């Protein structure tokens, strides 16, 4: 992943690893890894606000942490996923994940981080003909891990920027 910082303009550029995690050169960041679970569900044409789609996304996030080798997980997202990962195969995982995110928000009042936004890009491409469906999808997916309404608002705006640009 590419992180902020100065890079000297000498020599031949090369792909670097590192960043905020122990990434190999060319390895995707944790946020990109998570966005692939959203993309897999979106690629089916599913309504990303539906219980079934959100359950599949939430299940994917949990599989990523438990089984697929998450290379790094943000502190807030880790706390939410850890609260539900053991019940990932039971029905209603998305509702339990949203409840865990809401509980964390109630306890800390500090859950407006950028994690939901970092994996939101794909959502802006899913309903190009419907800004309201795009907004609802962005908020629904964001709320799986980020209960602060500002996090959802940022995802709605970001998804709409992408949708309208396309």
Please give the residue ranges for each predicted region.
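Structured, active/binding-site neighborhoods that engage oxygen-rich ligands
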Residues: 1-166
């Amino acid at each position: 992943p590419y992180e902020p910082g100065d890079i000297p303009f000498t020599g031949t550029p090369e792909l670097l690893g590192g960043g905020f995690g122990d990434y190999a050169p060319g390895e995707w960041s944790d946020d990109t890894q998570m966005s692939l679970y959203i993309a897999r569900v979106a690629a089916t044409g599913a309504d990303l606000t539906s219980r079934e789609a959100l359950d599949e996304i939430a299940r994917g996030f949990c599989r990523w942490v438990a089984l697929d080798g998450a290379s790094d997980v943000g502190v807030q997202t880790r706390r939410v996923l850890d609260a539900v990962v053991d019940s990932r195969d039971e029905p209603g995982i998305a509702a339990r994940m949203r409840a865990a995110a809401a509980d964390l928000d109630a306890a800390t009042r500090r859950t407006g981080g950028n994690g939901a936004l970092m994996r939101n890009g794909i959502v802006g491409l899913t309903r190009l003909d419907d800004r309201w469906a795009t907004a609802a999808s962005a908020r629904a997916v964001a709320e799986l891990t980020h209960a602060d309404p500002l996090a959802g608002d940022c995802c709605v705006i970001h998804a709409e920027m992408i949708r309208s640009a396309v």
